[in-house]
Amino acid sequence: MHTFYKVISLLSLILLTVNPSFAIVNQLSHDESLEWPTDHWPENKIQLNDQDFKKIIDYTFSTESIETLGRTNALLIIQNGSIVYEKYNKPINRNTKLVSYSMAKSYIGLLTGMMIDRGFIESKYEKNLLAEWQDNRKNISISHLLNMQSGLDFVEQYDNNGRSDTLEMLFGDGRFDQASFAASVALKSITPGMKFNYSTGETNILSKIIKLRLQEQNLNYQNFINDNLSSKIGLKNTIFEFDSSGTFIGGSSVFANARDFARFGYLYLRDGQWDGETIVSKSWIDDTRKPAKNTYKMYSNKFWLPHPASRSLPKDTYFCAGFGGQYILIIPSKDMVVVRLGETYMRDNKVIENLSKIISFFPTR
């Protein structure tokens, strides 16, 4: 299992009784004196002469940091609607598409909200989701799948030492129809919704449900994403990977450059609004920023909320996280989105600490 999730599993015992406070800070509207970043990001790059800032940036992108941070490929900071800092590690550049890994799960969170807004999914609490679920799995709700609480006996492992449903789904017999593979797993808990269990499989199941509901409306999944998200907010350098069954691999597979990942984060920072249009309702964004029940107050609608492993971040931060140290941080108190892409294959809480130090040089709004 990836070390980030090992840390989360260990901390969950502590979080039953203790969790750092999570601040809800109102998010600002876009500054209409600036163009929306649909085609181009406005740039207002800072010139920080602070030697401490230069020192930490130099360290972040140096070979000296490999043992603690891994390799940092990209760092992009958006504040007040403009790029204020951007740096890449060669040969990576601003046009390079990099894999999201589990940050893709947050895209499924967004798509679920868009489906509910349109009435294609009744609500988060809708059950009887798949025809093949005729046993107690019929009691699994959309909310359970959003918040890793289905009760399915899906084993999230990233090595070959024992059973790994994740590897079998991604690279084994399940790879052609990943959601159906995950949906075939039996229940471990008789009653869904009682326990948080991190699962890439659950996210792919939810993606299949989205596909099926779109088919009921005679809509193609890829076209729906393009027409209602990508073309609206300018995701010109983003690829959504689909498996052979036509289901978006929402558990792990978005490829994008840092600027497009920042657009996704900026949509959330602006309460789902983009250049006069509502991409997803503000109520969905608000719901995402509140911890879901039975998630140890650290997860909601496929986003992470502050917890001990991220305690150095501002307390209102909510974020996407992926294997290898991929992050999209959304920080309303600083009117900021931070994208960090890298290759970190050790405990990546050091990456969070590093980002926290960098963020501290930028003013609170």
Features from the language model and the residues they span:
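Active-site Gly/Thr loop motif
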Residues: 235-238, 242, 289-337
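Bacterial N-terminal signal peptides
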Residues: 8-17
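N-terminal leader/targeting segments and the immediately adjacent pre-domain N-terminus
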Residues: 16-93, 117-121, 147, 179, ...
